[in-house]
Amino acid sequence: CSNISMATKAYEFIKEEPPVLVDWMPWSHVAGGNKAFNLALYNGGTFYIDNGSPNPNDFAKTVKNLTDIGPTWYFNVPKGYELLVTEMSKNTLLAKSFFKRIKLLVYSGASMPNHVFEQMEKLSVEYTGEKIFFSAAYGASETAPMTTMPTHRCNFPGNIGVPQFGTEMKLIPFGDKFEVRLKGPHITPGYWNDEIQTLKSFDKDGFFKIGDALKFQDKSNPDLGFYFDGRLSENFKLNT
């Protein structure tokens, strides 16, 4: 509940208009089973199961579902958005349905290609007259999942925003990067039946060591948010 409360507080429109989601994410994944499903439940919204997926061989189902039902909040991975903007560029019925009441577009899990971000903004202006808020989100299973989100419009992809309400963030210098550690009511208390891993995963102040590095968009203005700067042990993310 704490993670859903954080998101609701960050985006006031959710209270004014109960969210409508059309979502493909498996409920075995914390983003689908907690964030997406409970966002609708917590706010008296409507949750439609998308039986498609961001896979070229399965995306036709998603196209049909989004043509039938336009969401107000939409989440996908970058590959899903790439397939979506390609289809909307030639499918007017899909684009009209998708944009008729959309308020927020969210992606996570990988880097968003610039051309996909720009094409989505172009389509949103074409069908709504304005740029729809299109943002990255950051977190992990242990953070329920989202722990940062942007609160201002970004003109380019990748900004993961600032800590959500109730989240404490600690930044530890790590070479030319900052290791990020997190604390809040949405953070897991530990790993089931694994005391050793639990002890290794928290510092002496109770901050969860997520294992990632971040960098400021602008060090002189932290309110502008952060960018993901790789794992501490590796500096790459898969595209999907």
Question: What is each residue range found by the language model?
Answer:
Residues 1, 140-143, 210, 238:
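Ser/Thr-glycine-rich phosphate-binding loops at phosphate-binding pockets of nucleotides
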Residues 1-24, 36-37, 43, 48-177:
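Conserved adenylate-forming
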Residues 5-13, 90, 126, 197:
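Conserved helix-loop functional segments at active or binding sites
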Residues 7, 87-88, 194, 239:
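Residue-level signal for well-ordered alpha-helical positions
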Residues 24-30, 37, 53:
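Conserved AMP-binding
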Residues 28, 54-55, 81, 112, ...:
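Short, glycine-/Ser/Thr-/acidic-enriched flexible segments
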Residues 178-238:
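Conserved ATP-binding/catalytic segment of the ANL
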